[in-house]
From Swiss-Prot:
Its EC number is 3.1.11.6. Belongs to the XseB family. Bidirectionally degrades single-stranded DNA into large acid-insoluble oligonucleotides, which are then degraded further into small acid-soluble oligonucleotides. NCBIfam families: PRK00977.1-4, PRK14066.1, xseB. It is found in: Cytoplasm. Keywords: Cytoplasm, Exonuclease, Hydrolase, Nuclease. It comes from Pelobacter propionicus (strain DSM 2379 / NBRC 103807 / OttBd1). It catalyses: Exonucleolytic cleavage in either 5'- to 3'- or 3'- to 5'-direction to yield nucleoside 5'-phosphates. Gene3D superfamilies: Exonuclease VII, small subunit (1.10.287.1040). One of its GO terms (molecular function) is exodeoxyribonuclease VII activity. HAMAP family: Exonuc_7_S (MF_00337). GO terms for biological process: DNA catabolic process. Heterooligomer composed of large and small subunits. This is Exodeoxyribonuclease 7 small subunit.
Length: 75
């Protein structure tokens, strides 16, 4: 999964959720799918955290110049 892309992992996670919500899996199949889903969710979360750390915002100062600041999301 180390070389997997975020978009690929997210699509796999969405498919796992659809399969689990479908209700046609056995208990063993459901547990296996759930474990795989947790791995994909963790991978996606880590990728999003990495992306957030890399995002910077350009802020305009009073004197007209710009400064780069870390992105601070509204929570």
């Amino acid at each position: 999964m180390a070389t997997e892309k975020f978009e690929t992992a997210l699509k796999k996670l969405e498919e796992i959720v659809r399969r689990l919500e479908g209700g046609s899996l056995s208990l063993d199949e459901s547990l296996k799918a759930f474990e795989e889903g947790v791995r994909h969710a963790s991978f996606c979360s880590k990728k999003l955290d990495e992306a957030e750390r890399r995002v910077e915002v350009l802020l305009k100062r009073k004197d007209g110049s710009f400064s780069r600041e870390p992105f601070q999301p509204d929570e």
